Design a protein with these regions (language model features):
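Radical SAM/AdoMet-radical enzyme domain recognition
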Residues: 1-111
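Accessory C-terminal segments flanking Radical SAM cores
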Residues: 117-221
Length: 221
């Protein structure tokens, strides 16, 4: 309920972006843009309404598609569509997602590999798919920070996110995450260096943020 207020409170000169499921963007996109939000990433793992509901457990696919349009209209671009490939669930929807972003310069498709923690049955290796896309791409751009490739394929811009296979992704990470139970998480792949910030304010909260930042180090060192 207070997301617009939070965005508005970000000091000038700092770019704000947001990853969202997109279900409320239809009504909030323009207010978020006015508040200073620059762009959005939208998590969307299926374009099939029944499949979408099965994956998310709630919400309507139509709300997300409306949110994508609203974000485009509000200028929250480029919009990255984050699709996590799930084995046996949405593997057959790749062409549908490519069609969704094809020909739209404001949309980028990010196909994300699910982390294979302990032999997850939903994990799907992206190697073969990326090789296929690379082979038939009109143009390939290598991003400087993570050395991640962007493929211009059938009118679509496509990126593959595979942190397990890209040490540069880890070495150049600038993220600090907050867990659902109020802990700072310096590294996506670790749970042994969390910093509890529940109930903390002011200088104490600032001190804990700095302490968490000092715990940051490449996971693959």
């Amino acid at each position: 309920e207070d997301i617009v207020k939070i965005i508005r409170s970000v000091p000038p000169g700092n770019e704000s972006s947001m990853t969202t499921n997109g279900t409320l963007l239809g009504s909030l996109a323009h207010d978020l843009r006015k508040a200073g939000l620059a762009r959005v990433n939208i998590s969307l793992d299926s374009l099939n309404p029944e499949n979408y509901k099965s994956i998310t457990g709630t919400g309507l696919l139509s709300d997300v598609l409306e949110g994508i349009q609203a974000a485009r209209d509000a200028g929250l671009t480029p919009i990255k569509i984050n699709m996590v490939l799930l084995k046996g669930i949405n593997e057959g929807e790749i062409d549908d997602f490519i069609h969704l972003v094809s020909g739209d310069r404001h949309l980028i498709l990010q196909i994300i590999e699910l982390m294979d923690l302990g032999g997850c049955p939903l994990h799907a290796d992206l190697s073969e798919l990326e090789e296929k896309i690379a082979l038939h791409s009109r143009k390939v751009i290598t991003r400087r920070m993570h050395h991640r490739k962007k493929y211009c394929y059938e009118g679509a811009e496509i990126e593959f996110v595979r942190p397990w296979h890209n040490s540069d992704f880890c070495n150049h990470c600038t993220r600090m995450r907050v867990t659902s139970d109020g802990k700072l998480k310096p590294c996506l792949l670790r749970d042994d260096n969390l910093v509890d910030i529940r109930g903390k304010r002011g200088e104490e909260l600032q001190r804990l943020f700095l302490a968490a930042a000092k715990k940051r180090e490449p996971y693959n060192k």
